[in-house]
Amino acid sequence: EELWDTVDGSAGKSLSQVFEGCAEVPLNVVGSVYPRYHNAAGKVISLEQVINMCRETAMGAKPFKWESRDMLGITAYIRMQSRGSRVNVAVDGKASAAFERGKKLYYQRVGQLDMSCAHCHEDNYGNYIRADMLSQGNINGFPTYRLKWNGVGSTHRRFRGCMKNIR
């Protein structure tokens, strides 16, 4: 929350002053609609990308490093503002091509184990792999704390871990 109100960059502004304009949606739902097609970016972007876009364009500040404490902290803070909102990620219109690419990757068998995301997150959700209960693959709970990481990690860190695990 402190980082949310911290003035940074050449424009002398904080994320709290510029974020809704950059995100193109109200703060109370932003965590439930990203990733989404972003008009100014002209493509589908993640919440982390819109945070850095705001920092660079509206604040004149340096972007946060992807897995930095600041990025994870501000992402968690912003997602908390959407707690209770129904997940409503648009997969039609200008977002449809990105959705179809993601869907193809989700079902594509990869690696030495010849597995897809669906093998765990559809066929085995609710079961355990070692000490981890498999989810349905929803990402709206990220960033999240994992004991294995001894800290908070992003969706993208989890993706990297899954891909590494299937070799």
Which residue stretches match the model-derived regions?
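Long compositionally biased, domain-poor regions of proteins
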Residues: 1-2, 135, 161-164
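Short, intrinsically disordered, charge-biased short linear motifs at domain edges
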Residues: 2-7, 99-108
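Short, compositionally biased low-complexity segments
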Residues: 17-28, 44-52, 127-134
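The canonical Cys-X-X-Cys-His
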Residues: 8-23, 74, 102, 112-125
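An amphipathic alpha-helical core segment
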Residues: 118-145
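Post-cleavage N-terminal segment of exported redox proteins
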Residues: 34-103, 126, 148-167
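N-terminal Sec/ER secretory leader and immediately downstream segment
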Residues: 1-37
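Short, flexible helix-coil linker/hinge segments at the edges of structured domains or between repeats
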Residues: 29-33, 40-43, 134-140
